[in-house]
Every structure is written in C-alpha cells, then in structure tokens.
C-alpha cells in the first residue's frame, strides 16, 4: 500500500512539474527572431502589439510605381504593415524589385518586434506573370493540363518559385485551381489546368508541392471557384447560379485535394452564389463560405487571403473599401489586399481602427487573424528554406532566368502541344518554291522568328493582339487579298478577334495551318483548316515547340484538357 502511495505522489509531482515547465517564460525584450516555440512566441508577440500593429499585420498593400513610395515605407516602419504585394507594373526591372524588397524588409526589422513582411506576387506561369524583366515566360497551367503529368506541375512551380525567391518574394498567389467549366470565361481560360475537377486538384497539389520545395508559400485560388462564369470579378461581381451540391462536387473538389495536402494559403474570390446565399454577398466577404464551409466543413487551418479589395467584385457589394475590409475580416479572412497607393487606404485604416477600440468582438477577430499570420511567418522564416530578407541585386544574373528551368520549360512545352487536327500539313515539308505567309500578332515576335528558323521562303502579315471590331474587320478583308498570293498560310490565333481573321481564309483554296495560343476555345470550330495545333501560351518555348511539332521534329502527344 505504501509503495502504491509513493508511486501516486511521484506521478502527481511529475504532472505538476510538467505543467509548470511547459509554460515557457519569454522575457519582455524578446522579438520575432527569439528562440522560443512558435505557438508560444506568437501569443507573446500578439500580446505585445498595439491595436495599430494588430490591424497593420493583417493588411497587404501594393505600390503604384517602380519603387515603393515614401508613404508605403512609412506604413511599414511606423505602423508595422504586415505584407506587401508586387504587381505587374512594378517589375520590368528585376534588380529594382530586389532592392525594393530589401528596403521594405529593412524597415520591418527596424521596429521593436522585428516581424518581417510577407512579400507576395502573382506568378502563375503562362498568361499571368506579374514579375517580368528577365524571369521565364512559361507554358502555363493549361499546357500542364495538356501534358497531363503531375511532375510537370511540380517542376513548373519549382522553377518559377526559385526565380521569384531570388528577388525576396516569399509568397505566390498560385496555383489557380478554378475548373474551366464555362468555356466563355475570359478571365480564367488558360490559367486553368482543365475542366476535370479531380485532374485540376491533382495538378494543383503537385504545383503547390513544387512551390513549397523551392521555398515559396503557395496560395490556391479563387475559392470557392471562378471557372463557371464569363464575367471578370475585376470589373463586376459575377453570379454563379449553382446549388451547394454542385459546388461541393465540382468547384470545391480541387480545394479538397489541396487542403488534404496542407496548402498553407487560400485566396477568397469576389464571387456571388445566389442559390447558396440569397443576399448576393461575395464569397470573399461571407462567413458562410469562409468560416462555415472552408474552415468547419472542409477542415482548412491555413491562411485565408482576399483577392484585391479594389476590384469591383468586392466594393460593388460593400459600398466602400472600409466596409469591405470589415466584412472580409468578420467573414474569416486573415489578410486583406488593397492594391492602391497607401494614401487611399487611410480611410480604411481610420474607420477599422476606431471599430477595434469600440468593439471587443472585432478586436478579438483581428487578434486571431494577426496571430495566425504571425504563426505562419514564424514557421516560414525560421525554416532553412525561406526567401532572403535582403536579396542581392548583384547576384540576380546567376539566378534569373533559371538555367535548369529554361531546359525544363522547353521540354514541357513540347509535351503539351496538341494536334487538334492533323491534316496534310503535319508534318509540314514545303518544297523550295512554296510560298508561305505567316500571319500573327505584332506582340508575338517569337512566332515569326521560330517560323523563319525552319522555313526561309516566308512573308509576314501582322495584326494587333487587341483589336476593335472595325480594325478586325479591316484586317480580315486585307488578309483575304494578301493570302491569294501564297500557297500556305500559318496563322496564330490567340482570341476571338484573331479567330475571326482566320475564318476569312476558309474558302480560298489554300493550305491553312492554325496555331492556337492561350485558350483553345476560339479555334475548336475551325475544322475547315488543314492542320490545327494547340499551344496554350505565347511563351518563346511554346512557339519553338509549336513549330517543332509542325516540322515533324517530335509527335504532338498533348491532349485537350477540356470536356
């Protein structure tokens, strides 16, 4: 009996000691980089933060020019802005991007708690490439869908991420896992992996894994799914008229794949589902979508980030940026993006800071979001694979473009090329007297250059990528007249306007080869052409692959990833 009592007493003392020592005492002068368990350090940091700092931590701002404005820099070092976004208008000079990131991170480290910035961009690959300069122009998601290999998704993301990581960018708003359901979707199109939800989910999960391996945080978008609308949420609030069962079995499927793989971030979309929520509120501002569905039903525990709140899809419903911000936080977002210059965000700041001071519930919601952001920052920045806080512009030539990546992107482009119609021009072996007309967009010089590497007897007919109806009509009549003097016409089709020009070659009795780039939808009914090749992007690798396939250098084995 005495022995049992002694064991019981020892057990009780052990439990008490375990409880006491499990609560780490963090000194008052600790900061973000102090060596303590992440969960406890996150609690400590949030407890030390003022309302100003808490609110700032859940904001992500962009800047208007090539370099951050003095006002944005002040937001970082005076208020503790938590995140910044690199947009396409900031990025023609990658060295300037790197130095801008370093400047902003240095300001973040001058504050007492030394919490670094999340630095994000949209580098999806293919059509969407916000960081330009010397970065790789890649085949893109639909090309990955056409090749069908998850390993292509993995390495596409891996090499894209290595390039932007060299610039100090630590978060990428990719992959896009919207199903290409509505074939008239102008905003998604080739950004999608395809129409099959399971397929999209598998490729999205592989893309995410490649990003993580390279040291960049991936972000799946646009929850709960942007693929079944022809409207663009930049200018409108799209309404998607499906019920919850359809949503669950189609739109949500790719997100389920990614949640199972512990995707660290998901972007909420400005999309209305009136059959699910009758008041028309966008998913990005909806507690039903973000808390009830994403958090509770799907079990997602990572960061939720809004799409840009300056898009009409958000502000049209909320009525003002300030109210949209409040609704976004109350719905369950952790980071709110506003792309405008910092001065436009002052009203957002003032009204929501006042609300924090008057509403305990709202303050607690902000605290919860700020804690989640800080916890993810602790786990990311203290890993051995984080992007540099202070990227060195002098070393970028060695890293951008990624040399290994260039080889991969060409091979991946070749795997993606789809012979939608083979015809008598595949392979194309013209005799020395054959007259060839190359018809393509002025903005795609690689189309003409790759053709002339293989076929010397070529003439050029150029038109603009973007044309009004009158210009397209004039070009259509002009190409009919010009094409009569040639035996074969090879035309690049990138949109409905260029497809209209191609249609005017239909009854001339000439051999016509259509090379489709971006979405293949405009050429799907052009069966009158002799040969149709699908390439899915206008990258130089894609044009090299398209002409390689046409020339018989390899077989075009890609498959159209649309239902």
Residue ranges and their predicted role:
Residues 75-94, 173, 183-184, 258-280, ...:
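Short acidic, glycine-rich surface-loop motifs adjacent to enzyme active sites
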Residues 9-18:
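Bacterial N-terminal signal peptides
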Residues 57-62, 82-88, 116-121, 125-127, ...:
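Structural recognition of the beta-strand scaffold that forms the well-ordered cores
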Residues 22-74, 78, 318-563:
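Preference for extracellular/luminal or secreted protein segments
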Residues 58-68, 141-154, 236-250, 312-319:
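Active-site mouth loops of central-metabolism enzymes
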Residues 50, 93-113, 127-129, 195-365, ...:
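Second-shell residues forming the walls of enzyme active-site clefts
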Residues 1-9:
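Bacterial N-terminal signal peptides that target proteins for export
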Residues 144-169, 176-192, 196-197, 204, ...:
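A substrate-binding/cap region within the structured catalytic cores of diverse enzymes
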């Amino acid at each position: 009996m005495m022995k049992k009592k002694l064991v019981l007493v020892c057990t009780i003392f052990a439990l008490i000691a375990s409880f006491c020592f499990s609560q780490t005492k963090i000194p008052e002068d600790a900061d973000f980089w102090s060596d303590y368990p992440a969960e406890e350090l996150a609690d400590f940091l949030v407890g030390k933060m003022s309302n100003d700092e808490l609110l700032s931590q859940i904001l992500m701002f962009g800047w208007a020019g090539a370099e951050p404005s003095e006002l944005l820099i002040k937001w970082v070092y005076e208020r503790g802005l938590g995140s910044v976004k690199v947009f396409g208008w900031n990025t023609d000079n990658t060295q300037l991007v790197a130095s801008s990131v370093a400047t902003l991170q240095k300001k973040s480290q001058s504050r007492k708690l030394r919490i670094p910035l999340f630095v994000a961009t949209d580098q999806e690959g293919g059509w969407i490439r916000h960081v330009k300069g010397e970065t790789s122009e890649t085949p893109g998601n639909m090309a990955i869908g056409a090749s069908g290999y998850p390993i292509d998704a993995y390495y596409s993301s891996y090499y894209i991420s290595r390039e932007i990581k060299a610039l100090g960018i630590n978060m990428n708003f990719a992959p896009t896992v919207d199903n290409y359901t509505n074939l008239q979707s102008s905003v998604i199109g080739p950004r999608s992996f395809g129409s099959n939800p399971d397929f999209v989910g598998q490729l999205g999960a592989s893309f995410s894994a490649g990003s993580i391996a390279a040291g960049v945080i991936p972000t799946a978008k646009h929850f709960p799914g942007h693929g079944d609308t022809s409207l663009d949420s930049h200018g409108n609030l799209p309404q998607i008229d499906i019920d919850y069962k359809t949503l669950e079995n189609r739109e949500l499927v790719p997100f389920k794949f990614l949640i199972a793989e512990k995707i660290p971030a998901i972007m909420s979309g400005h999309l209305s589902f009136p059959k699910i929520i009758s008041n028309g509120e966008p998913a990005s501002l909806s507690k039903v979508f973000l808390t009830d569905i994403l958090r509770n039903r799907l079990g997602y525990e990572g960061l939720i980030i809004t799409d840009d709140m300056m898009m009409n899809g958000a502000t049209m419903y909320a009525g003002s940026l300030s109210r949209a911000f409040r609704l976004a936080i109350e719905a369950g977002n952790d980071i709110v993006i506003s792309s405008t210059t910092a001065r436009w965000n002052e009203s957002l700041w003032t009204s929501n800071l006042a609300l924090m001071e008057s509403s305990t519930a709202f303050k607690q919601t902000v605290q919860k979001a700020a804690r989640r952001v800080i916890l993810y920052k602790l786990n990311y920045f203290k890993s051995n694979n984080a992007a540099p806080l202070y990227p060195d512009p002098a070393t970028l030539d060695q890293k951008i473009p990624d040399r290994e990546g260039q080889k991969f992107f060409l091979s991946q482009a070749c795997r993606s090329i789809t012979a939608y119609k083979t015809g008598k021009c595949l392979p194309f072996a013209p005799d020395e007297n054959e007259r060839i007309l190359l018809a393509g967009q002025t903005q795609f010089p690689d189309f003409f250059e790759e053709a002339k590497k293989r076929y010397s007897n070529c003439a050029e007919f150029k038109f603009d990528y973007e044309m009004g109806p009158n210009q397209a009509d004039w070009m259509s009549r002009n190409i009919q007249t010009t094409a009569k003097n040639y035996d074969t016409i090879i035309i690049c089709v990138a949109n409905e306007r260029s497809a209209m020009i191609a249609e005017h070659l239909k009854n001339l009795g000439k051999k016509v080869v259509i090379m489709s780039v971006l979405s293949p939808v405009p050429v799907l009914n052009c069966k009158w052409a002799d040969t149709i090749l699908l390439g899915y992007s206008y990258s130089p690798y894609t044009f090299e692959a398209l002409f390689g396939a046409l020339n018989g250098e390899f077989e075009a084995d890609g498959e159209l990833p649309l239902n």
